[in-house]
Amino acid sequence: MATWDEKAVTRRAKVAPAERMSKFLRHFTVVGDDYHAWNINYKKWENEEEEEEEEQPPPTPVSGEEGRAAAPDVAPAPGPAPRAPLDFRGMLRKLFSSHRFQVIIICLVVLDALLVLAELILDLKIIQPDKNNYAAMVFHYMSITILVFFMMEIIFKLFVFRLEFFHHKFEILDAVVVVVSFILDIVLLFQEHQFEALGLLILLRLWRVARIINGIIISVKTRSERQLLRLKQMNVQLAAKIQHLEFSCSEKEQEIERLNKLLRQHGLLGEVN
C-alpha cells in the first residue's frame, strides 16, 4: 500500500504537466472560455478525481434499524430543471462552441490556403493558365467568398460576446488576419500582377494555420468536457448504487446472524454445519 509521501510525489508529478498545459493553452483561449479561471480549470481537470477521493469519507457500517431508516434516503437525484428557450445570441453562442462548426472552419481555412496557392502557381506560370485567365479569377472569387464567411463570423462573434471577444489574444489575431486578407483580396481585384501583395496574402494564409490549431484545441477540449460530464454522472449513479448495496448487505448479514442465533438456541447449528 502506498504511503502518504509516495502519494504526494505522484500527485506533484501529475500537477506539473497540468501546469505546463495550462500555461500553453491560456494563449489559445477563445470566446466562451473563462479567461481568468483558465489555469485553475486545467489543474482541476487533472487532479479532480484524486481530490474527490481524499475529500470523500469512507462509508461507515450501518446496522439494524439505522440501515433500514437510511436506505430510503438513497434516492436518485432529481432530474435537471427544464432549460429556458435560447434566444438568438444564445443560439449563436452554442453554434460557435459546437464541434461541427469548428470542423467546418478548419476545412474552409485549408481550402482558402489551397486557393491562394493555386493563384500563385498560375500567376508565376508554373502551370500555364488558360487564355483568358478564367481559372485564376474563379479561384480568387472563391477565396473572397470564404473570407466573406469569416468576416460574418467575426461580426457575429462581436455581437454575441461583445467585450469578452477582446480578452482573447487568439481571437484578435485571427480577426486581424481575416480583415487584412479580405482587404488585400479586394485590392487585387483592381490591381493585377501585384506579386508583393500576393506574397503577403500567402503569408497571412500561412498565419491562419493557427486557426487550425485553435479548432483542434477546441474540438479536443469540448469532447473532454463532455466525457468528464458523463463520467461525473456515472460516478454519482454508481456511488448511490454502492451505498444501496452496502445497506442491503448489512441487512442480509444481520438477518443471517439472527437466524444463526435461532439455530444455536434450538441446538440445530451443529447439525446444519
UniProtKB/Swiss-Prot annotation:
<feature type="topological domain" description="Extracellular">
    <location>
        <begin position="191"/>
        <end position="197"/>
    </location>
</feature>
<feature type="topological domain" description="Cytoplasmic">
    <location>
        <begin position="1"/>
        <end position="100"/>
    </location>
</feature>
<keyword id="KW-0851">Voltage-gated channel</keyword>
<dbReference type="GO" id="GO:0051453">
    <property type="term" value="P:regulation of intracellular pH"/>
</dbReference>
<dbReference type="GO" id="GO:0034702">
    <property type="term" value="C:monoatomic ion channel complex"/>
</dbReference>
<dbReference type="GO" id="GO:1902600">
    <property type="term" value="P:proton transmembrane transport"/>
</dbReference>
<feature type="transmembrane region" description="Helical; Name=Segment S2">
    <location>
        <begin position="139"/>
        <end position="161"/>
    </location>
</feature>
<feature type="coiled-coil region">
    <location>
        <begin position="223"/>
        <end position="266"/>
    </location>
</feature>
<keyword id="KW-0969">Cilium</keyword>
<dbReference type="InterPro" id="IPR031844">
    <property type="entry name" value="VGPC1_C"/>
</dbReference>
<dbReference type="GO" id="GO:0071467">
    <property type="term" value="P:cellular response to pH"/>
</dbReference>
<dbReference type="GO" id="GO:0030171">
    <property type="term" value="F:voltage-gated proton channel activity"/>
</dbReference>
<dbReference type="GO" id="GO:0035579">
    <property type="term" value="C:specific granule membrane"/>
</dbReference>
<keyword id="KW-0282">Flagellum</keyword>
<keyword id="KW-0391">Immunity</keyword>
<comment type="function">
    <text>Voltage-gated proton-selective channel that conducts outward proton currents in response to intracellular acidification. Lacks a canonical ion-channel pore domain and mediates proton permeability via its voltage sensor domain. Appears to play a dominant role in regulation of CO2/HCO3(-)/H(+) equilibrium in sperm flagellum. Prevents the acidification resulting from HCO3(-) synthesis and thus sustains high HCO3(-) levels inside sperm for capacitation.</text>
</comment>
<dbReference type="InterPro" id="IPR005821">
    <property type="entry name" value="Ion_trans_dom"/>
</dbReference>
<feature type="transmembrane region" description="Helical; Name=Segment S3">
    <location>
        <begin position="170"/>
        <end position="190"/>
    </location>
</feature>
<keyword id="KW-0968">Cytoplasmic vesicle</keyword>
<feature type="compositionally biased region" description="Acidic residues">
    <location>
        <begin position="47"/>
        <end position="56"/>
    </location>
</feature>
<feature type="topological domain" description="Cytoplasmic">
    <location>
        <begin position="219"/>
        <end position="273"/>
    </location>
</feature>
<dbReference type="GO" id="GO:0005886">
    <property type="term" value="C:plasma membrane"/>
</dbReference>
<dbReference type="GO" id="GO:0045087">
    <property type="term" value="P:innate immune response"/>
</dbReference>
<keyword id="KW-1003">Cell membrane</keyword>
<keyword id="KW-0375">Hydrogen ion transport</keyword>
<dbReference type="GO" id="GO:0007338">
    <property type="term" value="P:single fertilization"/>
</dbReference>
<keyword id="KW-0407">Ion channel</keyword>
<dbReference type="InterPro" id="IPR031846">
    <property type="entry name" value="Hvcn1"/>
</dbReference>
<feature type="modified residue" description="Phosphoserine">
    <location>
        <position position="97"/>
    </location>
</feature>
<dbReference type="GO" id="GO:1903426">
    <property type="term" value="P:regulation of reactive oxygen species biosynthetic process"/>
</dbReference>
<dbReference type="GO" id="GO:0022843">
    <property type="term" value="F:voltage-gated monoatomic cation channel activity"/>
</dbReference>
<dbReference type="GO" id="GO:0060046">
    <property type="term" value="P:regulation of acrosome reaction"/>
</dbReference>
<keyword id="KW-0966">Cell projection</keyword>
<keyword id="KW-1133">Transmembrane helix</keyword>
<dbReference type="GO" id="GO:0009268">
    <property type="term" value="P:response to pH"/>
</dbReference>
<dbReference type="GO" id="GO:0016324">
    <property type="term" value="C:apical plasma membrane"/>
</dbReference>
<feature type="topological domain" description="Extracellular">
    <location>
        <begin position="122"/>
        <end position="138"/>
    </location>
</feature>
<keyword id="KW-0813">Transport</keyword>
<feature type="transmembrane region" description="Helical; Name=Segment S1">
    <location>
        <begin position="101"/>
        <end position="121"/>
    </location>
</feature>
<dbReference type="GO" id="GO:0045454">
    <property type="term" value="P:cell redox homeostasis"/>
</dbReference>
<keyword id="KW-0175">Coiled coil</keyword>
<keyword id="KW-0597">Phosphoprotein</keyword>
